[in-house]
Every structure is written in structure tokens, then in C-alpha cells.
Amino acid sequence: MHLLYFCLCLNLSINILSYMKHLKKHILVILCALQVQYSLALNLQKDWLIDGSSYQAKVTTTDKELCLSNGLLSRTFILSPNVATIAFDNLMNGNAELRAIRPEAVLTINGMEYPVGGLYKQPVQNFLNNDFIEDMISCDTAFTYVSHTVGETIERFPYRPKQEWLSNKNPWPAPGKRIVFTYKAAPRAPEMIRNVTVKVIYELYDGAPILSKQIEVENQGKSSIVLNSFKSEILALTETAPKVHYGEPHEIRMLAQEPGTYTRNYRK
């Protein structure tokens, strides 16, 4: 009799434990589902494609630096000894995209090439840190920083959207922040360009990871000049497709490695 009672109690205990384990699995599944739903809801709130109203462009400044950011991307400039982009960050995934400093632009005037801004003497080109930046110098032939202004984006051309084609009434110009850097020719520059002023203009827009850039060249001298060509953007970016995990050729993203040149025969 005692043995039978013991067996019944043991069987009941096993059934209870099995039920508890089964119940625990259900509770775990429910908690996981709630976590996934919460994460999705959180991502939906932060997704700029769905609602980008929280990503407002702004400009922050310190003694020697200026940062243009909207919560999705940021671009940081150093102002002395010359203006140069020292950081270009993807805030959506936390990646730092810049590995080396380049001029802000390059102009070819009367057949001669002149950098605009930028710093030189970076000891290595595959990464960038503050120690490198502190020891870098301005090129003696580069257009040098004079001043900058910060304001709102401006209308580049008149635009009247046809409301019957649009579901949303978006403002024009697209709202955001605008920075204008003004440069003058270096003291050692040739006489023909000493009265040339260059403006490099950046606009970062609200609610989207979009940055526009343009340059303006003004000759205030008496002699005419010829602007043969220009490079408005030169960025030394971190490698996104190293050889250790490359796939087929169409899967490789090709980037400019040096001003004016591109990678070739990448798989070799």
C-alpha cells in the first residue's frame, strides 16, 4: 500500500514538473514575442523613412571644430590651421566612415591645380586619430580659410509643386542647416589667383541622411582666369569590401582611394 502511494505521488510530481516546464516554455515564447513587438515598435519610431520629424539638423561649435549633424549622419570640420573634414559618421549604424583627411575641394585654374582647405602630413592613410590631426599642417599653395556663416537652407531655384501630384505638402526649400566656408588664395599663390575667392557650401536636411555640397568661385581681380576643372568632393573612406570576404565582382563596392583615381583589378 505504501509503495503504491509513493508511486502515485511520484507520478503526480513528474506530471506537475512536466506541466511547469511546458508552461515555462509558453511564458518564454510570450516574453520573446513581446520583446520583438517592442523592438519593432521602437524601430518604427526611429525609422526616418516612416517618420523623420525627430531628426533635426543642427550645428555645434567649439573653439577649433564645427559639427553638422541631424542624428542620422554627422560631418565634423576642424577650423585651424585650415578647414578640413576630420570625421564623417553614419549615426544610423555607428560607423566612422573617414580614414584620412583630404582637401575640401580642388580647383584647376589656368592649368594649375590648387587645393581648397585640407590638411597634410598624415603619417598613415588607413586610419585617423586626434594625435595625427594635431601634427598636421596646411598646404602652402592651398586656398585658406577666412570665415564661415551658419544659417538655414535657401531656395536654389523657384519651385512650385503641383499639389495634385503630391500626397504631402512638403516645404520648399527643404528645411535644414547651411554652412558657407569662405577661402582666399594662399600668400604664396601666383598673382593671377590672389583675388580669387572660393566658397564651399554644405546643406544638411531635416529628417533624412542627405548632405548636399556646392562650390562658388569668384574672381575679383582685373585679369581673367580659366577654371579648367574642379573636384567638389574628395573623401578617403574606410574600406567596405576587404578581400578577406569579397564575393562576385558585382557584389563589391568600389570606392575612390585617392583624388581622381579609382580601384582597378580589385580581385587581383
Located regions from the model:
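Bacterial Sec-dependent N-terminal signal peptides
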Residues: 1-43
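Polysaccharide-binding surfaces and accessory modules of carbohydrate-active proteins
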Residues: 42-59, 64-68, 73, 87-268
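Short, surface-exposed terminal/edge motifs of secreted or surface/virion proteins that either
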Residues: 75-77
